[in-house]
């Protein structure tokens, strides 16, 4: 069994895969509670960590002491059919790298790869499997919260309120109260960035790319895209974990 672990900015996610790539079980916890996590037993472990050394140290304290294979990944120049076009390949976030590998494995075609969590990453894969660049912006909740913190008359919207406001996923762009206007602004900033990347990649590749979306706000972004681009968008759960499975099993 292979245990895949994705230490993100706010939460740590994990998934247990069997040899044929079936996800048998998965879970998550806040990084602040990582030492209480009950991880499943596995013979191999592969980890992506973008949460820093403190979280790595805490995670290591609960990993099995017995001699099993534990691999902390770094982005490579080329792996699993994906070429890394970053200026310094090792500086690409390991979560982005794993998600790109999973996306290429799924489509093997031009893709916009979106991971929507505390931050939103929007990355471009061309028709040959080369990562040609991407962008990072604040997550939807983070945009709303920070706007309230630095303005005099706008409310500070907590994560709880933000999630509640988004329960139906669709947000009217013509908002008629301040809280909804802030919510709409954050959502459509993220969606607009996704749509711009999709348009730019279509021009670059001379064909229509797919959009693969993962992360806690994946549904919120997908449901608020506009126009024909919606036909190319799909949600893929656990994209980073699936990429980690591929790296462990198919990378040289």
Q: Across the structure, where does each feature detected by a protein language model lie?
A:
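Nucleotide/phosphate-binding catalytic cleft detector across ATP-hydrolyzing
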Residues: 1-11, 15, 23-111, 128-252
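Divalent metal-binding pocket/active-site signature
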Residues: 114
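Short beta-strand-to-turn element immediately C-terminal to the catalytic PLP-Schiff-base lysine
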Residues: 17, 123-126
